[in-house]
Swiss-Prot record:
Protein name, per record: Protein translocase subunit SecA
Bilayer-spanning residue ranges: none
Membrane association type: Peripheral membrane protein
PROSITE patterns in alphabetical order: SECA, SECA_MOTOR_DEAD
Entry keyword Chaperone: no
Keywords: ATP-binding, Cell inner membrane, Cell membrane, Cytoplasm, Membrane, Metal-binding, Nucleotide-binding, Protein transport, Translocase, Translocation, Transport, Zinc
Source species taxonomy: Bacteria, Pseudomonadati, Pseudomonadota, Betaproteobacteria, Burkholderiales
Catalysed reactions, as listed in the record: ATP + H2O + cellular proteinSide 1 = ADP + phosphate + cellular proteinSide 2
Record bears the keyword Membrane: yes
GO MF: ATP binding; metal ion binding; protein-exporting ATPase activity
Enzyme class per UniProt: translocase
EC number(s) per entry: 7.4.2.8
Length: 931
């Protein structure tokens, strides 16, 4: 109450910021007359003048009014577009490292030019980040004319580009590209063996377009560079036969034994998107696997040697029960292709990890591709937080303002619209069944069609869009379908979606980034005529003028009919995505309307609000085909959406806290790699490692401060001779001296190791040997880091079980991850020292040969893939307390269970050994009981 009273007097934080920025806009407008008098060359010369002033110490903030005025004038001359005052405010918000929420059609692409131009003057690079290659290329070419006019260079960073093209793109003043490609380039730069192979400069300033999609929707899914691991193709095929033999249990058993409506072998948690075997399910699965010869008779799935089988059982179950064709994926050209749950786009090249993708391939009887081992990974959360300054734009950020601030430290500023919005958002209509809902949707579409009003119908899946398309065909209504299967025609369909009587069905936000103009997009049609060289210039001008005249007529016709009408056939989990769909109508003060049609069979209502709404309908004795249209119901649905949003935020926050652990370690490893790449000579580093390793070896047999009776000299001599190529008569040395102590023995061995090393260097020369050392160091670091990533995945999947032992899973994860990291760094020192001490060389040629052999044995894996793993299934593993993260991260990266090498081995456990689950109990009293 007090807050509301104070806001009335002083205004909200947002209002105060906008008022503050309006003062700067007044200063920019005051410069406009003066800037307009400049010639093109004088205007272009301003860029050089600004750069000199920055070099002399002037701040970007002080330059802002002049730079913005210059950019606006250049845009007016080159693009024939003058920035509105509200766009100037948007540019300031971006420059100050905040998020600008601007309504659809308010010109976000043009707004980005202001902040990009100003920050590019400093010469440290600006990245403009978009959601797909099409938008990156379109915006770079479109806005590039403005930047080039002002003397700035523009680069485009697309997937599949050559190395030198990428370097040139990043060297440009302003670089356009996709979030995936910027992230992958960062990871690739930290896998190179030469400094010249890197493409990125230090991360300076990023403007993220559709910031909510990139920093929130995709925040939970890491970018992964992976290589092929061990092949388990046959196992996936065998396991695919299991789920059809199992029956679903309806209802959960309560403490008093009630609650199960129909007994079965597995339970499905739709809210959490998880599947669990029941006791009878375990028994049946074990019986079937024993029959197929995959486990021994009477063996448990929980026996340590069968843990990998357990992973395959659950992967097959989830593939059959949680992932559905044409909703979560499509099958094209003998491949399973993921459908993005947020945009409805196809994502070729991306794969679910943790064996799930292979299980789906087995289910669909297509070619099963091998599992992958993670070589490098990073989440968008951690990648974008590395920029010195980060900002973003979107049409819908206010609902997620808390998360932007909490995770990224980004404040959201709602920018006023240039013209007051005229869109009418009608009350939701809720029906009992999906059939009744679709009947109502068809009626609404027919009415709009008859009065010449264009309609955009939003659906949540390809399956629903094709069902609606079928119903429209039956009703004799011509329409276009915009889903992942029509991806290639997307821009053309969106361009024409605003024409009279046009009906367009779109999955989620497919087509985002392209405005729907009432009357159709005349610019697109004009561009085709302009590009046709066979048409004479005067004929071109006549045809383009004719197009504009026709468009004016159509534009007025659509406005009279009520503008674009948006129909939502289902509420999304997030209010933000609903708002994005609504936001396609009513751009720049145009008329428009929106309405959502829901049914009690929709997942959101069924899981979160169905019982309450059904009770209201029953109480009101609603006849079939009659809808509820009441504020109380709409509020109930929004409350359900808020619950889902809060839950997803908690998952993202938890994931970030876990990922921060590996992120800190990643920073250390990548910093070490960069230092190694840039160092002229690493002899000092190698020497420190050697001394540390030799000291550890000697102390095993001759402890510090010990007496002669405690020494094991024969064993020390043998170890030094066999493992380190040091043939020392230490026993003889001790016999000849009456007062030698443990420290003197260590000094003698260290000196011998130094001499052995120097002798090798002398044979081939310092420069050649230093290059060999660098190569060995990088290869060893990369190989052990890969194994460490696999071990962390392993650890993360089981860490939630510590909650049952009254331990904090998060703290346990941090502690054990640190121990694993320390062990990995020790292993790097041991391995590098062992190779350097043991290598036998006589010439520089032999040295190169040795480096190549080591690279073949432990270098990068083959068939490297770049994935942005889908998180749809994993996002929901929200079980109680600390259990959230373990399941939630199950899909995040391919885990180590099936990998070869130490990280993937599951050792046999003795009955009296601690149980591998981490409970602290003996194996025989814990999981051993199940055997």
């Amino acid at each position: 109450m007090t807050t509301g009273f104070l806001q009335k007097i002083f205004g909200s934080r947002n209002q105060r910021l906008v008022k503050q920025y309006q003062k700067t806009v007044a200063a920019i407008n005051a410069l406009e007359t003066q800037i307009e008098t400049l010639t093109d060359d004088q205007l272009r010369g301003k860029t050089g003048e600004f750069r000199q002033r920055i070099a002399a110490g002037e701040s970007l903030d002080k330059l802002l009014p002049e730079a913005f005025a210059v950019c606006r004038e250049a845009s007016r001359r080159v693009l024939k577009m003058r920035h509105f005052d509200v766009q100037m405010i948007g540019g300031m918000v971006l420059h100050y490292g905040k998020i600008a929420e601007m309504r659809t059609g308010e010109g976000k692409t043009l707004v980005a030019t202001l902040a990009a131009y100003l920050n590019a003057l400093a010469g440290r690079g600006v990245h403009v980040v978009t959601v797909n290659d099409y938008l990156a290329q379109r915006d770079a070419e479109w806005m590039g004319r403005l930047y080039n006019f002002l003397g700035l260079s523009v680069g485009i960073n697309l997937s599949g580009m050559e190395h030198d093209q990428k370097q040139a793109a990043y060297a440009a003043d302003i670089t356009y590209g996709t979030n995936n490609e910027f992230g992958f380039d960062y990871l690739r730069d930290n896998m190179v063996y030469e400094t010249d192979s890197r493409v990125q400069r230090p991360l300076n300033f990023a403007v993220v377009d559709e910031v909510d999609s990139i920093l929130i929707d995709e925040a939970r899914t890491p970018l992964i560079i992976s290589g092929q691991a061990e092949d388990h193709t046959e196992l996936y095929v065998r396991m695919n036969a299991l789920p059809p033999l199992l029956e679903r249990q309806i209802g959960e058993e309560k403490a008093d034994g009630t609650g199960v409506e129909k007994p079965g072998d597995y339970t499905l948690d739709e809210k959490g998107r998880q599947v669990f075997l029941t006791e009878s399910g375990h028994e049946k699965a074990e019986r079937m696997l024993a029959e197929w010869g995959l486990i021994g008779d009477g063996e448990s799935l929980y026996a340590p040697q069968n843990i990998t089988l357990m992973h395959h059982v659950y992967a097959a179950l989830r593939a059959h029960t949680l992932f559905h064709r044409d909703q979560h994926y499509v099958v094209q050209n003998d491949e399973v292709i993921i459908v993005d749950e947020f945009t409805g786009r196809l994502m070729p090249g991306r794969r679910w990890s943790d064996g799930l993708h292979q299980a789906v391939e087995a289910k669909e009887h297509v070619k099963i591709q091998s599992e992958n081992q993670t070589l490098a990974s990073i989440t968008f959360q951690n990648y974008f937080r590395m920029y010195a300054k980060l900002s973003g734009m979107t049409g819908t950020a206010d609902t997620e303002a808390y998360e932007f601030n909490e995770i990224y430290g980004l404040e959201t500023v709602v920018i006023p619209t240039n013209r007051p919005p005229k869109r009418i958002d009608k009350q939701d209509q809720i029906y009992k069944t999906a059939k009744e809902r679709y009947d109502a949707v068809i009626r609404d579409i027919r009415e709009c069609h008859e009065r010449g009003q264009p309609v955009l119908v939003g659906t949540t899946s390809i399956e629903n869009s094709e069902l609606l398309s079928h119903l429209l065909k039956q009703a004799g209504l011509p329409h276009e379908v915009l889903n992942a299967k029509q991806h290639a025609r997307e821009a053309a369909i969106v361009a024409e979606a605003g024409r009279p009587k046009r009906i367009t069905i779109a999955t989620n936000m497919a087509g985002r980034g392209t405005d729907i103009v009432l009357g159709g997009n005349v610019e697109k049609q004009a561009a085709f005529i302009e590009a046709d060289e066979s048409i004479p210039a005067d004929e071109k001008a006549r045809r383009i003028q004719q197009l504009h005249d026709e468009w004016e007529t159509l534009h007025e016709q659509v406005k009279t009919a009520g503008g674009l009408h948006i129909i939502g056939t289902e509420r999304h989990e997030s209010r933000r995505i609903d708002n994005q769909l609504r936001g396609r109508a009513g751009r720049q003060g145009d008329p428009g309307s929106s309405r959502f049609y829901l049914s009690l069979e929709d997942p959101l209502l069924r899981i979160f609000a169905g019982d309450r709404v059904r009770a209201i309908m029953d109480r009101l004795k609603m006849p079939e085909g009659e809808a509820i249209e009441a504020g109380i119901v709409t509020r109930s649905i929004e409350s359900a959406q808020r619950k889902v949003e809060a839950r997803n935020f908690d998952i993202r926050k938890q994931l970030l806290e876990y990922d921060d652990v590996s992120n800190d370690q990643r920073k250390v490893i990548y910093q070490q790699r960069n230092e190694l790449l840039e160092a002229h000579d690493i002899a000092e580093t190698i020497g420190a490692m050697r001394h540390g390793v030799i000291s550890e070896v000697v102390r095993q047999f001759v402890p510090a401060g010990s007496i002669e009776e405690q020494w094991d000299l024969p064993e020390l001599e043998e170890t030094l001779r066999n493992d380190w190529q040091l043939d020392l008569a230490i026993q003889e040395m001790v016999n000849e001296s009456s007062s030698i102590n443990a420290d003197e023995i260590l000094d003698a061995v260290t000196t011998a190791a130094d001499e052995h090393y120097e002798a090798k260097v002398a044979l081939v020369g310092r420069e050649s040997f230093s290059a060999f050392e660098r190569s060995i160091m990088l290869q060893t670091l990369d190989r052990l880091w890969r194994e460490h990533l696999a071990a962390l995945d392993h650890l993360r999947q089981g860490i939630h079980l510590r909650g049952y032992a009254q331990k904090n899973p998060k703290q346990e994860y941090k502690r054990e991850a640190f121990e694993l990291f320390a062990a990995m760094l020790d292993a790097v020192k041991q391995e590098v020292t062992r190779i350097v001490m043991n290598v036998q060389i006589q010439s520089p040629e032999q040295l190169e040969e040795a480096a190549e052999q080591i690279e073949e044995q432990g270098g990068q894996l083959g068939n490297v893939e770049f994935q942005h793993a889908d998180f749809a299934a994993a996002a929901a593993a929200a079980t109680a307390g600390g259990a959230v993260v373990a399941d939630a991260t199950a899909e995040m990266v391919s885990h180590a269970m099936s990998h070869s090498g130490p990280a993937g081995e599951v050792p046999r456990v003795g009955r009296n050994d601690p149980c591998p689950c981490g409970s602290g109990k003996k194996y025989k009293h814990c999981h051993g009981k199940l055997n």
